[in-house]
Structure formats: C-alpha cells, structure tokens
C-alpha cells in the first residue's frame, strides 16, 4: 500500500469524508494527484469511502442541528456531492420537514409570548435562514397558531 492510501485510511478512521474532501486533504498533505486518485479508488473499492454513506450521515447530523433541505443541499453541493444523490437522500425525509422545522422553531422560540407581526417576521426569517422553504414555514406557523391560539 502507498503512503497516500495509509493517510486516507487514517483520515477515514476518524470520520466520513466526501471523495472531494478526501482528495483535497491528501493533496494538502503533499501527495501528487496520481497517488491521491489511486488511494481514493482503492478506498472506494474496499468500501472505506462512500459518498452515499457520507451524505446520509451529513444530512442526519444537520437535521439534528435544526437545518432544512435547502441549506443542506447547498452545503453538500459545495462539498462536491452529486446533486442526484443529494436529492434522493433528501427525498426520503420529505414527509418530516415540517416536524423538523417545528422542532427548530420550538428550540429557538418556545418560551416566546410576543406574537406581533415584527416578531413573526423575525421567526420566519430564522426558518428561511435555516434552509426551510416557504411551504414548510407556512405549515409550521399554522401549527403554532393552532397550538398557541394566536
């Protein structure tokens, strides 16, 4: 085995990396492109590196942190992940986005008793910034209004 492959294994033993991230890390360590590609191909062949596994774990972590599909999709695209792969994994969660957005709202605003127009706008912007689309946000506010009798 090569030094690039050994270095890739050490990196992958700590956490999942996308193929592009792993390639960048190995290049930063001073390995030439040919060795990096060989190490990356060997890691994929042996199942040590998988973009699918990376996407699933990344999405799970970001959902847990209160982020929505738009922000997650953009972050993964910036990490060099195939958009079709991103879409297929995000699609598996499509029925849960309202619950995830409601959980993010509750974490930030649960103890809030001010439901003025400006406060609702602030809450709307917060959910938009977190990556939830307008349809999901409107469903969250319908739920909030019904449960808090606004």
UniProtKB/Swiss-Prot annotation:
Keywords annotated in UniProt: Cytoplasm
Residue runs in coiled coils: none
Keyword match Cytoplasm: yes
Keyword Cytoplasm found: yes
GO cellular component: cytoplasm
InterPro entries listed in its UniProt record: RecX_HTH_1st, RecX_HTH_2nd, RecX_HTH_3rd, Regulatory_RecX, WH-like_DNA-bd_sf
Protein task: Modulates RecA activity.
UniProt family annotation: Belongs to the RecX family.
Name recorded for this polypeptide: Regulatory protein RecX
Source species of the chain: Legionella pneumophila (strain Lens)
């Amino acid at each position: 085995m090569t030094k690039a492959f050994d270095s890739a294994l050490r990196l992958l033993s700590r956490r999942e990396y996308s193929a592009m991230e792993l390639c960048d890390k190995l290049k930063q360590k001073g390995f030439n492109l040919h060795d990096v590609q060989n190490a990356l191909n060997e890691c994929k062949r042996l199942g040590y590196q998988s973009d699918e596994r990376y996407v699933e774990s990344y999405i799970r972590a970001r959902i847990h942190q209160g982020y929505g599909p738009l922000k997650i999709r953009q972050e993964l695209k910036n990490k060099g992940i195939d958009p079709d792969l991103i879409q297929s994994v995000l699609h598996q969660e499509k029925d849960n986005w309202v619950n995830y957005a409601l959980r993010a709202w509750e974490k930030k605003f649960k103890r809030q008793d001010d439901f003025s127009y400006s406060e609702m706008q602030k809450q709307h912007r917060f959910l938009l910034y977190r990556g939830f689309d307008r349809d999901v946000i409107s469903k969250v506010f319908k739920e909030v209004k019904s449960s808090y009798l606004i």
